[in-house]
Amino acid sequence: MISSDVIIIGGGAAGMFAAAVLAEEAPELKVLVLEKGAKPLAKVRVSGGGRCNLTHECSDIRTFVQNYPRGGAELNGPFHRFGPTETVEWFEAHGVPLVTLDDGCLFPKTDTSEDVINALLHTAGRGNVEIRTNTECCKIWKFDGGFNVKLASGEQLACKKLLIATGGGAFIEGLGHTIEPCVPSLFTFKTSDKEFTALAGIVVEDVRVSVSGLKAEGALLITHGGVSGPAVLRLSSFGARILAETNYRFEMKINWLPAQSEEQVFQTLEKFRAVSPRKQVGTWSPVGLSSRLWKLLIARAGVDETREWGACPLKALRHIAAQVCGFVLPITGKNPHREEFVTCGGIRLKEVNFQTLESRLVPGLYFAGEVLDIDALTGGFNLQAAWTTGYLAAQSIAVG
């Protein structure tokens, strides 16, 4: 016997946004949200340090999707239908005015995620939506006309349409879909190089980091345990699966001056040697790097920092240029980025119709949010994917 028109598994951002949209667009539908945790929207509550980086400003969707290592191409169309602009309009229309920071991140003007949560719960509460917490699903199967959902408690539910909006869950594989393995994405790197970490606090605004053919550029921060910063986070995200295969033990190459070739750096050093032959190599960096970092690089090049420039043979200058453009750092592990625990993995994207977010394999089955093999570089982009897929799945269910 059908107990609900729609069951949504997962009371996170995507699931609750879908419930809120269904409450407004199809109030006649009986919607049941099943949440494994004690409260819905737990990750939204702590995102952005409790402030909730709701989305990111967007002037061009084609540029926006470049922030998604997996799923960017598939989200291009959906973002044109319900993207950052529409998200801002929706939340502001539901009592959550937003403010844009200098870095493009959008937060509630009140600086608290509770306003986002209250807006979603209040909107869902105006419709025919029931939310059950501490409720774990363990099995799903299709029958003619709907789906059966078996709970860990032994209870069985039935619905006409099913939206899965939760990450993980062995029950998904029973529906015939391919699950891409989940591995961490968006993390910083640890290193065993104590001389390097002794430089903690140094920021270099523009570097290129590379591993196994992958490259990323941006700022890099040396930390007490390793490296962080936009360049590292981008590399960790786009290289998530490759780095997982190494068990997070690999060598990362750092080019401290990506705007110049190694030959250009060498020529700069050669000119400085000609102009300032009596200066000691360690007292000044001709290429604009900080003194502490410069001293490490010349030491790794095998050059004594007290040596005068004029006494350095061309071979020594070549070695210094090689360190500037190809410093090798041993990586021995990873750390999560701040409070964000992003993973890649989930339903294989080609098995989903991104016009409707309906399964291409099982009619009446929809996906949104973390269950999809989509991830982004920062929390605001990840939440935008949740809002967009949740909204479009709900719209499709409402009109279907």
Question: Where do the protein language model's features map onto the residues?
Answer:
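Glycine-rich loop(s) and the adjacent beta-strand/alpha-helix scaffold that form part
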Residues: 161-197
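Short hydrophobic core segments
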Residues: 7-9, 34, 137, 149, ...
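Glycine-rich FAD pyrophosphate-binding loop
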Residues: 7, 23-49
